[in-house]
Structures are given as C-alpha cells and as structure tokens.
Regions:
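Long, amphipathic, Lys/Arg-enriched alpha-helical "connector/arm" segment
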Residues: 10-43
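Short, contiguous acidic/charged loop-to-helix segments that flank catalytic cores in large enzymes
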Residues: 17, 35-38, 76-89, 117-127, ...
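Conserved tyrosine-mediated DNA breakage-rejoining catalytic core shared by Y-recombinases
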Residues: 5-10, 64-100
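Short, charged hinge/linker segments at domain and secondary-structure junctions
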Residues: 1-15, 111
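Short, basic (Lys/Arg/His-rich) helix/loop patches that form interaction surfaces
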Residues: 32-39, 132-166
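Short, charged phosphate-coordinating catalytic segments
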Residues: 1, 51-72
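Active-site/catalytic core of tyrosine-dependent DNA strand-transfer enzymes
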Residues: 21, 26-28, 91-145
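Short alpha-helical "packing" element that flanks the helix-turn-helix/winged-helix DNA-binding module
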Residues: 30, 47-50, 158
C-alpha cells in the first residue's frame, strides 16, 4: 500500500505548537542561580519558582492571590480563566518566597499588586511585562533555546508531573 499525503506541504493556518516546557534540571538551575546582585532578576526568578511550586499557577492567579487564600496548610483559589476551584498543599519553598517579600499592610499574598487604590489590572499587566522581560534575560544567561517566560513554569510543571505520573 502506497500512502500519499497530497496536502503534506499545504499550510493550514495552524502552526505547530512551540514546546514551552523545560526539564527539571533547568528548573533546578534557575532555582539555584545567585541573583543577589540584581533584585529585579531575583524577583522574577522567585515568581517563576512560586508558579512552578504551585503546579504552574498562572501569573494572573498569582497576582490576585490574597493572604486569606492560605489557610490550614493549603492554598485555595479560583482560577481566573476557568473559575475552577483549586487547592494546593502549602510547602516550605512557597513560604520561603513569601517570607522574602514584604506585603505588610496588603491583603495580597505576593508583591505584584501593590496599591489597592490604583487600577489592579494595570498593576498586574505592568508586573507581568516586567517579570517576563527579566525571565527572558535569565533564560539567555543560561543558554535556553526558548524564551523563558512565566508560562514556561506552567508547562514545565505539567511535563515533569506527567513524567512522574502525578
């Protein structure tokens, strides 16, 4: 039987999805980087790692996390995109990141939305842009073949979890 694919070279308007996941080895390398010389790179890395530790939580969900979402050793929140309720066991590496940043006087868990009086969505978008530009810089420093963004943490967690049958 001869198989022919007459449309093999026809563009369908759908590009192949670029793989955004990185292996666990790269996640460890990102985690272990000494970024004490640049607080904005360190902040971006810490938010990337927080996302990874929280099963690849999206940046918008991290931005809107409230301290009240953390109770009895669990982080419980509604995903903005799907309105799905998610519950994640609170682990030491998550707490270490939270402890590193001062959010006293704020109801937010992470220092992304800093001023309740200012447009929250604008603050989130500005922070996302800053963090992703810093992550791209980090990715270049370690020679990643793809741009490092907050989205990579989500895909990395999913890929690593799948490989471990989680």
């Amino acid at each position: 039987v001869i198989q022919r694919y007459p449309f093999k070279h026809v563009y369908t308007g759908i590009d192949k999805t670029v793989k955004r996941a990185v292996p666990a080895k790269i996640i460890r390398q990102i985690r272990d980087m000494d970024l004490s010389h640049d607080s904005s790179l360190e902040y971006a890395r810490d938010l990337f790692m927080f996302s990874f530790y929280t099963r690849g939580m999206s940046f918008i969900d991290m931005a809107y996390l409230k301290k009240s979402n953390l109770q009895n050793g669990f982080l419980s929140y509604r995903r903005k995109k799907t309105n799905q309720q998610l519950v994640i066991k609170w682990e030491k590496p998550m707490q270490e990141i939270i402890d590193k940043y001062d959010t006293i006087g704020s109801s937010y868990l992470l220092p992304i939305i800093l001023d309740a009086k200012t447009d929250e969505r604008k603050q989130y978008k500005n922070a996302a842009q800053l963090v992703n530009s810093k992550l791209k810089k980090l990715g270049k420093q370690i020679g990643l073949p793809i741009p490092l963004t907050s989205y990579v943490a989500r895909h990395a967690w999913a890929s690593i979890a799948r490989s471990k049958n989680i």
